[in-house]
Amino acid sequence: NISLGSSATAVSTLLGTKVNITTPIVQVMTKEDFDFQDLEPAVGVEISYVKGLSGKSVMLFSRNDVRVIVSMMMGAEIPEEEFVMDEINASAIREAMNQMMGASATALSEFLGTTVDISTPISYEIDDGNAFKDKYFDGSEDSVVIRFTLEIEGKLSSEFINIMSVDLVKRLLEPFKAQFGI
């Protein structure tokens, strides 16, 4: 939540309007239990932590939410029936996520007391939900699934999902353990 507050500020600046990302709902899930049909058709955005942390963070957005964000960035409404995830739109959503996750990494750096750097985001449409789950849910390992409400003033009230490995989340929680003796 600390890092996503910074993310909301970064996206607000990019879009020129108020953006709110609500308190997360966190669940540890198996591949079999994970479902994202409410976001389909969905767009995935993956970043890798390249310094300070190890692992991937994957965000899932509905295709329509991506359309709204890209439209705002481009300054022109893109009708739903005309929106395609071509290179221009994919680049725009990567830039939005780069701003969002870059701000998140900066907040994490301060929180963890170490520099946290991320890779350039990779964005893609999810054509096969099972292949997506096979890629991001490592065998029988559980993953941490975090749902957020995304509100863009006057434009959007929706959800997005963040998926991380249990190991990555444990690393993120280490400062709490130290501070509270957990």
Residue map of PLM features:
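Composition-driven recognition of glycine/serine/threonine/acidic- and proline-rich low-complexity segments
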Residues: 1-181
